[in-house]
A protein has these predicted regions:
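Q-loop/switch helix immediately C-terminal to the Walker
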Residues: 104-116
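A short, flexible loop at the N-terminus of ABC-type nucleotide-binding domains that lies
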Residues: 2-6, 15-28, 35, 78-81, ...
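Conserved ABC ATPase "signature" region
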Residues: 73, 123-141
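ABC ATPase nucleotide-binding domain "signature" region
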Residues: 40, 157-160
Length: 160
């Protein structure tokens, strides 16, 4: 087992300029996640949880700080390498209803990241979607359902 942490965040900051001044959404966050560990980020609405996740995945640029994934500085890699790294990273949002596209079916939502990666054929994607649904305990009958037609537990499993 490697001594390199899975994720290491050092003095991470994300500020937004607003008409009323600077909003410090993420301010000096530090943590390490080792292989096999899980981190839950909790807090009140609007405290920066989602922003923190988006900055770690480099969906938003940080204002300052460093983010390492398996020893690689996410803030300094090129687009191709970042896409590769993101295949092993995920945010599970607290509210599965708000994080799922209401215009897409369950199978379309699950297939979307596989399509974006452009590594699998249509048939392979369909097979992978079936396997994923089985793995998280989603019955085949919900594959053509929309998020609003499912309970919170099923929506959460789609996000995962």
């Amino acid at each position: 087992m490697s001594n390199v942490p899975l994720v290491e965040v050092k003095n991470l900051k994300k500020y937004f300029n607003t008409p009323s001044g600077t909003l410090h959404a993420v301010d000096g966050v530090n943590f390490t996640i080792d292989q096999g560990e899980t981190l839950g980020v909790v807090g009140e609405s609007g405290c920066g949880k989602s922003t923190l996740g988006r900055v770690i995945l480099h969906l938003l640029d940080s204002t300052d700080g460093q983010i390492f994934f398996e020893g690689e500085d996410v803030t300094k890699v090129g687009r191709k390498k970042l896409t590769e790294l993101r295949q092993n990273m995920q945010i599970v949002f607290q509210d599965p209803y708000a994080s799922l596209d209401p215009r897409k079916t369950v199978s379309q939502i699950i297939a979307e990241p596989l399509i974006i990666q452009k590594k699998l054929s249509k048939t392979e994607i369909e097979e992978r979607v079936k396997k994923i649904m089985d793995t998280v305990g989603l019955a085949k009958r919900v594959e053509n359902s929309y998020p609003h037609e499912l309970d919170g537990g099923r929506r959460q499993r789609i996000g995962i």
